[in-house]
């Protein structure tokens, strides 16, 4: 999983991107190794769209937030911060899917926990899909990859600012739920 990096660290852009990609691959491997029934409830939060946005009319929505994806050193230790989140929801024929990866702050302050990767795969009302990947470092955009070969409505591509805003919102939801449930 991703090692904490102090703010202002002088890593090159290529090394930062490689670190993020490696961390994302590590998170995916850990999730594949654990089937949902076996995944410890204390290390995972599941929230439905009705709980997130009561009365909003969003259907079939679910957010999964995972803690402690790097259990190599202290398997019994529960991570205090979210590491990875994915959520889906549908509004009519429109489908939304997001993934977010964070790293832990060096100083243990949750306000300093930054997203490093944001992925979206959204399907518009014409059943056309667009994929978007943003890589961040210390809150700054490193790289953007957008695949819109199906020519989906561009409104379905979140901006980097929207991606960071969503990541912040989900981080707050995750940490509040973690506090309430412990």
Question: What role is predicted for each listed range?
Answer:
Residues 1-12:
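Bacterial Sec-dependent N-terminal signal peptides
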Residues 10-64, 123-182:
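Long terminal segments
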Residues 35-98, 102-103:
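Surface-exposed acidic loop/strand-edge motifs in secreted or periplasmic proteins
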Residues 80, 89-133, 137-140:
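Mature extracellular/secreted ectodomains of secretory-pathway proteins
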